[in-house]
Amino acid sequence: MPPKPADKKPASKAPATASKAPEKKDAGKKTAASGDKKKRTKARKETYSSYIYKVLKQVHPDTGISNRAMSILNSFVNDIFERVATEASKLAAYNKKSTISSREIQTSVRLILPGELAKHAVSEGTKAVTKYSSSTK
């Protein structure tokens, strides 16, 4: 039997907000239970696999590569990238600059890679930057 109007207690603010919260939860349940399930998109994993494969085909057109070898090379590229970026960041901080330029990248490559490998990397990097600069103009 419903209570008489005289028996009702004056409403306080706490129960009013408490009664609103379940309504919001119910609204959330209704949308979930309605069957409008969105198909989850698979998280894209960024790798260097396609680039590694292209370089492999330039150097050895008739040679393939296993998934395990590709994974190892991808880890290697990520590791070198992280080392160069960290070193370039330190160099920029030492020189009180907020921007990493090609000069910091070049210096960090010289510091990280040994001897002849550093020379080849710097020359290839310079060639790539020159090619990019000429194509954007």
From Swiss-Prot:
Residues 1-10 have a biased composition (Basic and acidic residues). Residues 1-45 are annotated as: Disordered. Gene3D superfamilies: Histone, subunit A. The modification N6-acetyllysine is found at residues 8-9, 13, 24. Monoubiquitinated by the ubc-2-bre-1 complex to form H2BK123ub1. H2BK123ub1 gives a specific tag for epigenetic transcriptional activation and is also prerequisite for H3K4me and H3K79me formation. H2BK123ub1 also modulates the formation of double-strand breaks during meiosis and is a prerequisite for DNA-damage checkpoint activation. Keywords: Acetylation, Chromosome, DNA-binding, Isopeptide bond, Nucleosome core, Nucleus, Phosphoprotein, Ubl conjugation. There is a cross-link at residue 131 (Glycyl lysine isopeptide (Lys-Gly) (interchain with G-Cter in ubiquitin)). There is a cross-link at residues 8-9, 24-25 (Glycyl lysine isopeptide (Lys-Gly) (interchain with G-Cter in SUMO)). One of its GO terms (cellular component) is nucleus. The modification Phosphoserine is found at residue 12. GO terms for molecular function: DNA binding; protein heterodimerization activity; structural constituent of chromatin. SMART domains: H2B. InterPro entries: Histone-fold (IPR009072), Histone_H2A/H2B/H3 (IPR007125), Histone_H2B (IPR000558), HISTONE_H2B_site (IPR055333). It is found in: Nucleus; Chromosome. The nucleosome is a histone octamer containing two molecules each of H2A, H2B, H3 and H4 assembled in one H3-H4 heterotetramer and two H2A-H2B heterodimers. The octamer wraps approximately 147 bp of DNA. Belongs to the histone H2B family. Core component of nucleosome. Nucleosomes wrap and compact DNA into chromatin, limiting DNA accessibility to the cellular machineries which require DNA as a template. Histones thereby play a central role in transcription regulation, DNA repair, DNA replication and chromosomal stability. DNA accessibility is regulated via a complex set of post-translational modifications of histones, also called histone code, and nucleosome remodeling. This is Histone H2B. The lineage of its organism: Eukaryota, Fungi, Dikarya, Ascomycota, Pezizomycotina. The gene is hh2b.
